[in-house]
Amino acid sequence: PPTLIIADIPGIIEGASDGKGLGFQFLRHVERTRALLHLVDVSLPDEDPVTQWRIIRDELASYGEGLEERDTLLVATKVESEESEKRAQALFEAAGLTDGLMISSVTGRGLEALRHRLFALTYPEVSDF
């Protein structure tokens, strides 16, 4: 069966494409990826998930190397309340998605769907995972 290699790149912050923090170092790692999985925490009432998503998209575009054109799966995480579900819907609407994926590690919500979507994104030629 096909396998996935997943690299967690947590250090992309606003200004990363200008070298802020460990920006270049992390963005060089992203260059080697086949696809991007963008996890956005929607549980925090004081954080705007749309802004967080846009910051990362802008940094990828500013860095260049075609990163903003990579196949990307946008996932709302920590969706465990009605409020977080509303924030997830706003995120997907801003991203122009009709099929955004909501997950929760606590409840297990959407985890199997995430696995399927990751394999489909990475191995589009394989139909059964």
Residue ranges and their predicted role:
Residues 1-3, 30-33, 67-70, 96-97:
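Short loop/turn elements that form and flank the Walker-type P-loop nucleotide-binding site
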Residues 5-6, 36-39, 73, 101-104:
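Structured core elements
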Residues 3-6, 23, 53:
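A general structural signal for well-ordered alpha-helical packing
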Residues 13, 17, 27, 43-47, ...:
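A short glycine-/small-residue-rich loop at the edge of a beta-strand within enzyme catalytic domains
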